[in-house]
C-alpha cells in the first residue's frame, strides 16, 4: 500500500479459515499506525496424489560463470544491496538488453539466510522487470500485486550459504500504465521453488 521505512513495524495475523488440509491467513503490516501492507496466504499439507512433470530448470551457465549485471536500476537501491546477483543473459550475449523480454538471474542473499518461504517471496520481488532492459522510459516499477505459489516442501531443501537460486522472469503484457510479469525460481539442486505473478505500475 505504501513503502515501509526503516524502523519498527507491527504485523497482525488473522486466521480466516482452517480446513482439513488448507489454512487461510491474512497479514496486516502497520508502521506508525498506518497500514503499509496487506497479504493473504494459503497453507496446505502435502498429500499423495497426481504428480505431473516438474518444470525443468533451464540449461544455463552457473553463477560462477555469470557476471554481476551492468544495470539493475538507474541508481543503487537498499533492496539490491542485500543480494548477490549474476546475469545469465549477459553471460550468453553482450547485447541482450535491447531485445529480450525474458531475463534469467542467479540470486542469493549476501548474508547467510536460512531457506524459508519468506526468502523465496523476497527473491521473487528483488529483480527488475525484463521490460526495464527494453525501454529507457521506465525508471521505476513498484510492485502493487504479488502472487507466489511455493511448489516445494521447504524443510526438504538442501540450502547453505553457498547456494543460489535461479530466477527466470518474463514481461508478458504492458498496457494502461501497468506491467504484468511472470516468473519461475529454482534452487541450484534443480527443484522448482515457486511460480510468481507480479503487477507493476509504469510511471
PLM ranges: what are they?
Residues 1-203:
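Terminal targeting signals and extreme-terminal segments of soluble enzymes
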Amino acid at each position: 500500500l505504501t513503502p515501509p521505512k526503516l524502523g519498527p513495524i507491527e504485523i497482525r495475523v488473522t486466521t480466516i479459515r482452517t480446513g482439513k488440509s488448507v489454512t487461510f491467513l491474512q497479514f496486516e503490516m502497520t508502521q506508525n499506525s498506518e497500514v503499509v501492507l496487506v497479504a493473504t496466504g494459503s497453507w496446505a499439507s502435502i498429500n499423495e496424489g497426481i504428480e505431473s512433470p516438474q518444470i525443468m530448470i533451464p540449461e544455463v551457465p552457473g553463477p560462477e560463470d555469470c557476471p554481476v549485471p551492468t544495470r539493475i536500476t538507474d541508481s543503487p537501491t537498499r533492496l539490491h544491496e542485500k543480494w548477490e546477483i549474476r546475469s545469465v543473459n549477459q553471460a550468453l550475449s553482450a547485447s541482450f538488453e535491447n531485445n529480450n523480454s525474458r531475463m534469467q538471474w542467479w540470486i542469493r542473499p549476501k548474508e547467510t539466510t536460512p531457506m524459508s518461504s519468506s526468502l523465496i517471496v523476497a527473491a521473487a520481488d528483488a529483480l527488475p522487470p525484463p521490460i526495464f532492459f527494453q525501454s529507457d522510459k521506465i525508471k521505476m516499477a513498484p510492485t502493487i500485486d504479488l502472487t507466489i505459489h511455493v511448489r516445494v516442501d521447504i524443510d526438504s531443501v538442501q540450502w547453505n550459504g553457498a547456494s543460489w537460486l535461479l530466477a527466470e522472469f518474463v514481461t508478458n503484457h504492458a498496457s494502461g500504465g501497468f506491467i504484468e510479469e511472470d516468473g519461475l525460481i529454482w534452487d541450484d539442486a534443480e527443484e522448482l521453488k515457486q511460480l510468481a505473478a507480479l503487477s507493476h505500475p509504469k510511471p
